[in-house]
Amino acid sequence: ETQNPNILFIAIDDLKPTIGSFGDAFAQTPIMDALSKEATIFLNNHTQQAVCGPSRASLMTGKRPDYTKVRDLKTKMRDINPDILTIPEHFKNNGYQTLGVGKIFDPRCVDNKRDLPSWSVPFIKENQLVYSSDYGPPALGYYQNKDIKNKVRQLRAEATSKGVKNLNKYVRDNYKPPFGSANVPDEAYTDGAIAARANLMLQDLSQNQSTPFFLAVGFKRPHLPFTAPQKYWDLYNKNEIELASYQTKSVNGPDLAYHSSGEMRSYKYPEIDYVINEENLLDLEESHQKDLIHGYYACTSFIDAQIGKILQTLKSTGLDKNTIIVIYVSYTHL
């Protein structure tokens, strides 16, 4: 009797088509490029709503936001539709072991178990990841750069002296760099730790292959802030980065299509002066534009490498012979 195939379900947060196989000659993504040669690639996809919570709720249920009623970053999906069926829940109901790690649902839009009905094994959240004592967890969940970590510690101490209860919010309101790097192992950053945990899960799953599995692995980069080990930044020459062709509003472009980049401006950094011009657009110096683009590509290559590690484990355990691999993006930027 043929066993149902396993499913490896990989989510990437905010990835645009900065992949070699999608025609980006600047991108260094050898793992996804190689995989794409054996895969079916979907080139005409459209997000239901370009906001994290609504997009993920829609994708994971196959329902439009008009149905899920998740249109923001606080509505709980099952508060509105308690019996809504998710992709992993469907597999669970049909004999699969379902488990996951990282960011699959937006945590603000599901319960604190990352949607309990979806998983037959407790979902592994970011605060359950393991980091070496050599470097510890990334500050604010993002940063391993020593200077940034020291600044975060200083601000936390300052908040404590002022009697502030939410220390991390105090730090983020005053200091949250949009990019960062450090000469540390991949596993020092959240996404490296996610890949490492996924590999352990695959190794455990390979010990008993009588039950098919649905393993969801959710990576958090290349969403802001653009943080990755230095070696991925070193893959790219900042001087070769091309800026966006259009730096102003298009002729007769509708105002609704433009905004003042509120999320970008929430990343407080003393070296960047966020200026809103007369067109209500964010003006950034060219060097900072290049820093951001550089960081985005570095993070894309970082995630590509983590996917490579997972695929290698899939192969070394023999699970690759009966596993369907899905790589998708929650939603993206143009």
Write out the residue ranges for each language-model feature:
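Formylglycine-dependent sulfatase
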Residues: 1-334
